[in-house]
Regions:
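N-terminal cap/lid segment of alpha/beta-hydrolase-fold proteins
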Residues: 32-76
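Hydrolase active-site cap/lid region
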Residues: 33-34, 39-43, 180-237
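Short beta-strand element of the alpha/beta-hydrolase
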Residues: 77-87
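Short amphipathic alpha-helix adjacent to the substrate-entry channel of hydrolases
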Residues: 96-114
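C-terminal catalytic histidine-bearing segment of alpha/beta-hydrolase fold enzymes
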Residues: 125-127, 262-264, 275-327
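Alpha/beta-hydrolase active-site loop
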Residues: 132-154
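Alpha/beta-hydrolase fold nucleophile elbow
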Residues: 157-169
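Short beta-strand/loop motif that positions the catalytic acidic residue
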Residues: 257, 263-265, 269
């Protein structure tokens, strides 16, 4: 009886500790979570700009984009587009997630936009689902969206002559992929890219967490889903899959012609493997590509715990606008 009561007390203490830890963590996230947004909050009204919502672009799933236009169109900045690409592990999120960021940069005089794109299913996947939500498809959709933005802006009397891509997490990857693959063929030429916490490569063995979230059981299926190419176990064993993985991995898209890159990563990120940023940095360095890396020493994937570093990143993004946009 004594032993049973003792075990119950120990169990209750453990339970209370866990509950206290979780509550404390949630309070801390709530306390800190609003701080990053305060850095980019603007008082938005028609003296700052206007938003054109749910505009069409050519894609197979009727995705839309939103366009943010500054009030003053008689400035060099108003000829520059900043395209924000939402994150969400490639399987969630929406263009509305980026509203505050778009309004912030529009308040600085830039045209901004945010886009919805095809997402990967979180459920059990058929072969068709594996093949039809790849990073290649997402890139093609964004390419189509930029063409639509160029046309829509022209109808509004705006001649967009250059752009930057940006994003957080999965959006950061797509921003880099777009900038490195499409800088010259984009309807609006890309001058630079800036991103936070974007995965830089997709070697399947590095991605046990994402495979678990997406209910992917084999490396071959993971590679298939990311690339849109039917990857077999035999291709995995022979390394024949590697060129396809490289084609959707920012690190391996970098060359001497790549655009300047601003990036930030948390050192205790439990979602994106922290080691993946180093080959990206090496690739930029080896190819002589201008870059800045802002390190968030106390931050996980949400980048909540280094407000000073986030402010540094935002300031640098505006410096990139001044330096790399031709005004």
């Amino acid at each position: 009886m004594f032993s049973t009561n003792k075990n119950r007390k120990i169990g209750m203490l453990i339970f209370l500790f866990v509950v206290s830890f979780i509550v404390g963590m949630l309070i801390n996230i709530q306390r800190l979570g609003s701080l990053p947004m305060k850095l980019i909050q603007v008082e938005w009204n028609d003296t700052v700009g206007c938003v054109y919502e749910n505009l069409d672009y050519e894609n197979p799933s009727d995705h839309k984009y939103d366009l943010y236009v500054p009030k003053n169109l008689d400035t060099p900045e108003s000829k520059c587009l900043i395209l924000y690409i939402h994150g969400g592990s490639f399987n969630s999120g929406s263009k509305e997630d980026d509203d505050a960021w778009c309004k912030y940069y529009t308040s600085k005089g830039y045209v901004t936009a945010t886009v919805d794109y095809t997402l990967q299913s979180k459920k059990g996947k058929s072969e068709e689902e594996l093949l039809n939500a790849s990073l290649e498809l997402m890139n093609e959709e964004i390419l189509s969206c930029v063409a639509a933005i160029k046309e829509q802006a022209s109808q509004l009397g705006i001649d967009l002559t250059q752009m930057a891509t940006c994003g957080v997490s999965a959006g950061g990857t797509l921003a880099m992929n777009y900038a490195y693959k499409n800088a010259d063929i984009s309807a609006i030429p890309v001058k630079f890219v800036f991103q936070l916490a974007g995965p830089a490569s997709f070697e399947p063995s590095d991605w046990s967490l994402l495979k678990s979230i997406d209910h992917i059981t084999t490396d071959a299926d993971f590679a298939t889903m990311m690339t849109g190419v039917r990857i077999t176990d035999e291709m995995m064993a022979s390394k024949e899959y590697l060129p396809y993985i490289y084609s959707v991995s920012p690190t391996y898209l970098v060359d001497a012609n790549s655009v300047p890159t601003l990036m930030g990563y948390g050192l205790i990120d439990h979602c994106v493997p922290t080691q993946l940023k180093y080959p990206l940095i090496d690739a930029l360095k080896e190819n002589g590509v201008p870059y800045d890396y802002v390190e968030f020493p106390k931050s996980n994937h949400g980048m909540y715990n280094d407000i000073d570093k986030l402010q540094e990143f935002i300031n640098l993004s505006l410096e990139y606008c001044d330096k790399y946009f031709d005004k």
